[in-house]
Each structure stands twice: as structure tokens, then as C-alpha cells.
Amino acid sequence: MNDTTGTLGHAIFTGLEKNEYLNEIYDALLHNDFLRLFRIDDIAQKEVDTEDALRFADLLSKSVNTEQSERHRSLAQEIITLLNALNPDDEEIQYVMGAVLSSTSNYLGLQHSVPDFQENNVLDRLSDEINRDYLRIPSQQDGYFLRSQKAVYDHMTEDDYFSYSGPTSMGKSFVMRTFIRERISPDCNFAILVPTKALINEVSKEIADNLGELLRQHDYRIITSAGAMILQEKNEHRYVFVMTPERMMYQLIGFKDIPIHYLFI
């Protein structure tokens, strides 16, 4: 691991999330947004210096060389989202929102919230275009990975075995579905292991909703039980298995000649 303790980024950003004034602004924004959401008029809003809040959001979005960089970038997006919700017609907030979402590589959010945003600086625009190309989802002109998703996807495509643990909000299921979509072919079967029976329907429905048409075009079947009748046709079709480990074990014992090319646990 590279030592970043002597870098300017480390000096600027380390401990920034503990800044008392930053947390005061953040708490005030949460308070005011709570009043807005529930239409509470008999409690006073807390005073927020919008310019200072914007500066913090912009600074946090550029966090590097610290273990808290992901947290900083997430906080930047929270602050700018709260500011925009409280001041929906403020052009300065709209611009900084675009800059924050661009700096954090949240291009999906950028398309939704500030579709016309463009960096003022030519070099920033060039950097932004390069970054977009890097994060663009295969076969999707206007779809983009988050940077953490891109790192996982690259490992999945390059490594024979890959293990990763991340928060639910990272979108691991989305990355898995993207990987499957790009590898649907006459020669590939996929297996997804889920920890409980209750998750079988949820995961298989997600696969059907997101990939159903493509799976049908390539003669795939989604299989949730080792006793499914269609398995008697053996390799007449391609398969996406969604099963618990126990069901998968019976599947492998009962149908040894149906290969599994990609396994997700």
C-alpha cells in the first residue's frame, strides 16, 4: 500500500469530517430539511451560511489520500443534495452540485439532477470526459459505474476468483447483473447462491426484470429448484441458477453434465 501520510491531500483532508463547524452546518441542514419534509412551520429553522456549506461540499468532494476519502465524498453529496432541496432555484447551488457530482464521479446523479452541467475550465472538461469514458458501462452509452463499482467489475472480468465485501448501497447486485449481461452467450451458465430461500424469489425477479428480454433472446432459463422439469432437457438451453447452497449441491449431484461457468456467492 502506498504511504500517503506526507502528501498535501493527507494534510488537508485528514480529520476533516470531525470539523466542528462542518458538523454544525450538516446538523442544521438535516434539521431544516426535516422541517421541510414534514411541513412543520412552528419550529424555527437553523441558520446556515450557504457559501460556507458550498465550500465544504466542494472541498469534501475532492478528498484524496486519507482513509476517510469515501466518507468525505459521500458527505459532500449529502450536503449539496440538502442545500438543493432547501433552495431548489438557486443557480449557484445547482452549479456546485454539478461540480460535486462530477468530482465524485456520480454521473448517474449528474444526469438526473444537473444534466446540462459543464465544467468551466477546459482541462477540467477534458478530465471529466476521460473519466466518463473510463466509468462508462459496457454496451450503455449513457450509463456509468460508480468508481467503487468499476473497481469490482474490473476484478471480476480479469480475475479467475474474486472476493469482495462492501455496503449494500454500493450496488453489488447491479455489478453482478452487468457482468452476466456482458457474458450471455451459447456457452455460459451462471449460478447465484443466496443464503436463504426467501431471497431466491427476490434475486430471480431482479434478474428477470433487468435481463429477461436478453435471456429469452439467447434461450436462457432461470432455475430456482434442482428438480425443475426443464433440466431434464439437459444442455438444450442455457441457465441462470438462483439457489441456496443446499439446492445447488443437489443440482450438481443430479445434473453433473450441466456445467457452471460463473458462480456468484
Specify the residue positions occupied by each region the protein language model found.
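N-terminal helicase ATP-binding lobe
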Residues: 1-265
